[in-house]
Amino acid sequence: MGTYTLECAGCRHTIPDNYTLRCECGAGLIRARYTARQISPRDLPGMWRYYDWLPTRGHLDTPGAPVTFKSQGLSKELGLKELYISFNGYWPEMGARMDTCSFKELEAPPTIVRAREHGGRAMVLASVGNTARAFAYLSTLTGFPVVIVVPRKSAHNLWIPGREPGDSIKLITMEEGNDYSDAIRLSERIAGIEGVMPEGGARNVARRDGMGVTMLDAAVTMKRMPDDYFQAIGSGTGGIAAWEAALRLRDDGRFGDRLPKLHLAQNLPFAPMYYAWKAGRRDIIPELDMPEAKKQIEAMYTDILSNRNPPYGVTGGVYDALIDTQGDMYAVTNDEAIRAKRIFEKAEGIDILPPAAVAVAALLQACDRGLEKKRTVLLNITGGGLERLRKEVSMSMVKPCLNVEGPEVPLENITKAIQWQTLSKKS
């Protein structure tokens, strides 16, 4: 059993875990402190190999896990001799079976298990695509009820691989003009309904430590931590997760004593964390860093990488992760991402999702700026294999139970649409 305590990154106090998402001090993110100082992979399915560093008592029989391998094609293209790829998606011959084609499939299992273990009857979350798909898939597999809120333009991302969507999924779409932050606002209101538990976003240790499995798997495979870690970010939760996993690996003592340098990328024109970081600021100033946020988001290559309220300046957040790892941020244009996608797919022989292409573009920028060829680099391909999956696996769309104009919709409309009495009795 992966035993742990919770500690606030702000006040450093130990906190009891009652599916706790916030410390009373309000100063920082909560972290899990695990009893197991060293990671010992278990004989368990998928990501649960790293059970000792996941904040749950039980586990699920889910096969999804990252696959880490040494690049041949892209490494030759870039002249990087020690380039490793963490592939999160569908690529059967490589052993990759994240059938939702996104590393968000690492978030959902421990989050749902943690919620169940703390008496959760249902969960609500907001998303613009990959997170929603992962939780919908896990809801279908487990029967655990989820209420998912997405902008209607993102509803095409809600499909279930290999089976029909479960009745446990209640999808609410929002009219045109609403974005991820509007979906978050509505989900926060829905979490006020009795019996509905908030998913928690970046504040949920299960979500972060689930994504941290990417770094754990890479270190175990490589027998060391990388020198450099590249990932595209929207909220930055994945970057925080990589940093926290690296801190544990450093304390483990077998994978090196230097933290990987984080290279985190945003997709222009919406890149508030990039602008704040380059200005040397801990805080995002909306009028400077995202002056026309909704218009900027509409112009992105991948609006999955958008969040108007990211955990950037909070203690234990993205800013601290970059400072602690001597990291850097990148701004990637749409054309750069499209070009990077073509380069990767030709070099490695598998399709990748747009957010992963942004990470590849950041790596190309770093190489152009003189990234040392001898450094050990880990590139997180956060999603891929979708085109391959479409040819080999059936996909069923999740149908919405309600479409709303905005986040201030009367809650009685929500309660009626999700058939709350039925939903709350399932778990």
From Swiss-Prot:
Its EC number is 2.5.1.76. Keywords: Coenzyme M biosynthesis, Pyridoxal phosphate, Transferase. Coiled coil: none annotated. Signal peptide: none annotated. GO terms for biological process: coenzyme M biosynthetic process; D-serine biosynthetic process. Transmembrane segments: none annotated. The keyword Transferase applies. Pathway: Cofactor biosynthesis; coenzyme M biosynthesis. Its cofactor is pyridoxal 5'-phosphate. InterPro entries: Cysteate_synthase, TrpB-like_PALP, TrpB-like_PALP_sf. It catalyses: O-phospho-L-serine + sulfite + H(+) = L-cysteate + phosphate. Pyridoxal 5'-phosphate binds at N130, T382. Homotrimer. NCBIfam families: cysteate_syn. Specifically catalyzes the beta-elimination of phosphate from L-phosphoserine and the beta-addition of sulfite to the dehydroalanine intermediate to produce L-cysteate. Belongs to the threonine synthase family. Cysteate synthase subfamily. This is Cysteate synthase. It comes from Methanocella paludicola (strain DSM 17711 / JCM 13418 / NBRC 101707 / SANAE).
